[in-house]
């Protein structure tokens, strides 16, 4: 798969919020290049729910589902490396949590410092 780097850079320079749906290995690559990027780990509500979702997709052979469940342990063990965790139990709740994280990230000092630098100087009587 892969993400088009040029398209990503264009979106970032336009000030857009960019959300990448990638695995933990892809997240590690992104964070290596952009250490200030936010990382969000989406957790299933339970192992049973994860298994039921894989079966419910009706796309994979039972052997593939079994392999995916085995891979889930390694994937889930990477969660502590992420900035935020969202439990995807109720979709709308998970979506609201994602929106809240994105909204809060827009106010990080690193993101708004240049935008508000003049205002801060004026408030401090320096400009």
Residue ranges and their predicted role:
Residues 19, 72, 86:
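Residue-level signature of catalytic and energy-coupling elements of molecular machines
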Residues 7, 71, 97-101:
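Alpha-helical elements of Rossmann-like donor-binding domains used by nucleotide-donor carbohydrate transfer enzymes
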Residues 59-60, 77-127:
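NTP-dependent small-molecule kinase module
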Residues 62-71:
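Glycine-rich S-adenosyl-L-methionine
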Residues 2-59, 76:
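ATP-dependent NMP and nucleoside kinases share a basic, alpha-helical "lid"
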